[in-house]
Amino acid sequence: MVEPLLSGIVLGMIPVTLAGLFVTAYLQYRRGDQLDL
């Protein structure tokens, strides 16, 4: 009963975590560009 729920939570969190890391890296990259200017 618990395993499908747990796997669903994990599968749901993986894309969110990857998206968060991507956005953070993108914002840091933009900030670096602005500092260079």
Curated annotation (Swiss-Prot):
Keywords: Chloroplast, Electron transport, Membrane, Photosynthesis, Plastid, Thylakoid, Transmembrane, Transmembrane helix, Transport. The chain crosses the membrane at residues 5-25. It is a single-pass membrane protein. It is found in: Plastid, Chloroplast thylakoid membrane. InterPro entries: Cyt_6/f_cplx_su5, Cyt_6/f_cplx_su5_sf. GO terms for molecular function: electron transporter, transferring electrons within cytochrome b6/f complex of photosystem II activity. It holds the Pfam family PetG. The keyword Ribosomal protein does not apply. GO terms for cellular component: chloroplast thylakoid membrane; cytochrome b6f complex. GO terms for biological process: cytochrome complex assembly; photosynthesis. Component of the cytochrome b6-f complex, which mediates electron transfer between photosystem II (PSII) and photosystem I (PSI), cyclic electron flow around PSI, and state transitions. PetG is required for either the stability or assembly of the cytochrome b6-f complex. The 4 large subunits of the cytochrome b6-f complex are cytochrome b6, subunit IV (17 kDa polypeptide, PetD), cytochrome f and the Rieske protein, while the 4 small subunits are PetG, PetL, PetM and PetN. The complex functions as a dimer. Belongs to the PetG family. This is Cytochrome b6-f complex subunit 5. It comes from Staurastrum punctulatum (Green alga).
